[in-house]
């Protein structure tokens, strides 16, 4: 699996301290430059002294050709990532990408299928929930194999999406990752 999910847009306009961006603390380019110079110049960026976060526009670019970014359960920019499977003794070399929809929760059922393992119903006296995923072994030998995953639900911080038989429906939640989520003090209710 090439990445955890889409590129991250929480950096808003960019920051030398990711927690500033995540907590909606605005900073300026001049402040970024001053901090970088104080910590060793441009060579400090990306090193152990900084926890920098790129501009949200770079996240959109990084998720191309899909729209949106990490923390948005919509339109693949925040949810779709490539996976490469290699098993020279079982899978014949084939340069054709597979476009069948799969999800990370399909990996274990696929491994169980390959190893002919039936998932246990009870482990150490504890009843086990059934696995959510399905095996995608059929795609190993046939680039045009029919999809086996029919439905997958996505939800992150109120942003929701559902994939069903080739269709995707989605909606934004209460927070947009590239906008500072700082409520007005009158909106705070400590009780």
Language-model segment annotations:
Residues 83-85, 162:
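Short beta-strand motif preference
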Residues 1-13, 40-44, 60, 77, ...:
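Metal-dependent active-site segment of extracytoplasmic phospho-/sulfohydrolases and closely related
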Residues 12-27, 126:
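Short secondary-structure boundary/capping segments
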Residues 24-65:
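Surface-exposed acidic, glycine/proline-enriched linker/cap segments
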Residues 16-18, 82, 177-178:
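Generic secondary-structure boundary signal with a strong preference for alpha-helix termini
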Residues 86-90:
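Short connector loops/turns at beta-strand edges and beta->alpha or beta->beta junctions
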Residues 49-76, 91-100, 104-191:
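C-terminal cap/loop subdomain of S1 sulfatases and analogous C-terminal strand-loop tails that border
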Residues 35-36, 79-81:
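Short hydrophobic/aromatic-rich motifs at helix boundaries and adjacent loops
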């Amino acid at each position: 699996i090439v990445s955890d999910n889409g590129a991250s847009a929480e950096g808003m306009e960019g920051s030398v301290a990711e927690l500033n961006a995540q907590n909606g603390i605005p900073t300026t380019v001049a402040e970024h430059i001053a901090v970088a110079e104080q910590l060793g110049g441009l060579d400090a960026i990306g090193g152990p002294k900084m926890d920098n976060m790129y501009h949200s526009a770079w996240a959109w670019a990084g998720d191309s050709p899909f729209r949106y970014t990490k923390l948005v359960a919509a339109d693949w920019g925040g949810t779709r990532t490539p996976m490469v499977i290699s098993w020279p003794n079982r899978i014949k070399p084939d340069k054709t990408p597979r476009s069948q929809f799969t999800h990370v929760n399909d990996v274990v059922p696929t491994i169980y299928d390959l190893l002919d393992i039936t998932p246990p119903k009870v482990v150490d006296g504890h009843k086990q929930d059934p696995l959510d995923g399905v095996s995608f072994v059929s795609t190993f030998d046939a680039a045009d194999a029919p999809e086996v995953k029919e439905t997958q639900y996505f939800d992150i911080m109120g942003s929701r999406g559902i994939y069903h038989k080739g269709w995707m429906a989605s909606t934004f939640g209460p927070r947009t990752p590239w906008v500072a989520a700082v409520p007005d003090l009158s909106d705070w209710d400590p009780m």
